[in-house]
Amino acid sequence: MNFQNTNKPSKVVLSVGDESGIGPEIILKALYSNEIPENIEYILVGSKKNLQNTYENLRSLGLENLANPKNLKIQDIEICPSNNDPKSSYGDSSFQYLKKAIEIVKQYPNAALVTGPICKKSWSLAGHYFSGQTEVLAKSCGVKNVGMLFTA
């Protein structure tokens, strides 16, 4: 996919992952970057409240290079409050974020999906028995052979 040579904004949908984990922090740091092309539209899927709380907590620790959630397009799905306990509610939240992100990506033929980290134990506690996000994508898209790319 060539983001640089298009007249329309390309869409990148970001599922924030487990909101009690590092996903929200990673996304807020990444979207602050001045290296992001202007013709890309980012759509975050997650809890607007949690992203705002993460932003405020990180700012209170002295971190400045963060995207302000108030300036981001967020598909708000408020399922549970955030803490650092791998409860089933957090597993269900991250699973629902991924399902919604997949739904959005399917609407746009040139869209990309970025997934934040999840807690597989929380998914299991919530009754979502997939070995990972790649398998959810495969099932949602009706394919048998899948692959995953991890980059940092």
Spans of model-derived segments:
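Ligand-binding beta-strand-loop-alpha-helix segment within the catalytic cores
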Residues: 149-152
